[in-house]
């Protein structure tokens, strides 16, 4: 079973050579991006790592995303990547895991790790096998070309969340901890953008509250801020999973908005790259 790309040519270039060049531009961007390319990754991850990574079009969020992938490359190469993305389409199960086969991008095919899928399904009360939730969803797909560019070969577990409640976040964190017993060199990505379509000043204020909750590694505070301050962050459930995993350190690598790229500060979207270890 092959999951074909649905936002190639929209969120990122559909031609391999153009996509590689776009990713290089994101890394080499000195204004918002890190200003450097990742070098060869010669060692494997020794312990699990969490990553908060944006999922907008590469021209907007790609330079911010590059910070996270550059930092993971410095730590080591994952053999398994669990990617938790929000369900923007309303299709499929509340917690849908793509069970088998490959995900395709212009850079090639990425295998789904069926052993890891089985562990998550058996350890979670809410996760179900589901392809429908993934068919038109972009939040997981846009992470793959960056991963392919930096690491080459790896396997994935794609997890799509329509239900992003605290209960589900706690349940999935338990399931991921069970997974970590078998896969130590695993990268867990929470794919999310931050506040949406308000002016720059308002978005910065709201985004910094999200950053505060992440820095404190406090998922309850995150949910509190989302409700109290009306923050339209789309992938908060995946971030809550990371915050519930018991990582001992958090580093905020980069925050920016679409307004920093386009110059339009009336309606912006916030982007964050952060690493947990």
Swiss-Prot record:
Q: Which Pfam families match?
A: Memo (PF01875)
Q: Which PANTHER family match?
A: PROTEIN MEMO1
Q: Which family does it belong to?
A: Belongs to the MEMO1 family.
Name of the protein: MEMO1 family protein CTN_0605
């Amino acid at each position: 079973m092959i999951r074909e790309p649905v936002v190639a040519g929209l969120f990122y270039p559909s031609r391999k050579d153009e996509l590689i060049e776009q990713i290089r531009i994101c890394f080499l961007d000195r204004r918002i991006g890190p200003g450097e390319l990742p070098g060869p990754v010669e060692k494997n991850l020794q312990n699990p790592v969490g990553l908060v990574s944006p999922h907008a079009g590469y021209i907007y969020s790609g330079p911010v995303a590059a910070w996270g992938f550059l930092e993971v490359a410095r730590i080591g190469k994952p053999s398994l990547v669990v990617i938790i993305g929000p369900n923007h389409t309303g299709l499929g199960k509340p917690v849908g895991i793509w069970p088998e086969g490959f995900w395709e991008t212009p850079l090639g095919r990425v295998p789904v790790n069926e052993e890891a899928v089985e562990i998550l399904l058996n350890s979670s009360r809410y996760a179900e096998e589901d392809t429908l939730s993934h068919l038109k969803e972009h939040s997981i797909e846009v992470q793959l070309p960056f991963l392919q560019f930096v690491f080459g070969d790896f396997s994935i577990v794609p997890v799509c969340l329509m239900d992003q409640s605290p209960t589900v976040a706690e349940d999935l964190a338990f399931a991921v901890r069970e997974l970590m017993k078998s896969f130590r060199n695993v990268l867990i990505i929470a794919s999310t953008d931050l506040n949406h379509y308000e002016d720059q000043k308002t978005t910065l204020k709201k985004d910094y509250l999200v950053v505060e909750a992440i820095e404190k590694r406090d998922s309850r505070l995150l949910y509190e801020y989302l409700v109290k301050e009306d923050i339209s962050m789309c992938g908060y459930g995946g971030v809550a999973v990371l915050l519930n995993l018991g990582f001992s350190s958090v580093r905020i690598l980069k925050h920016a908005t679409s307004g920093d790229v386009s110059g339009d500060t009336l309606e912006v979207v916030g982007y964050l790259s952060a690493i947990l270890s």
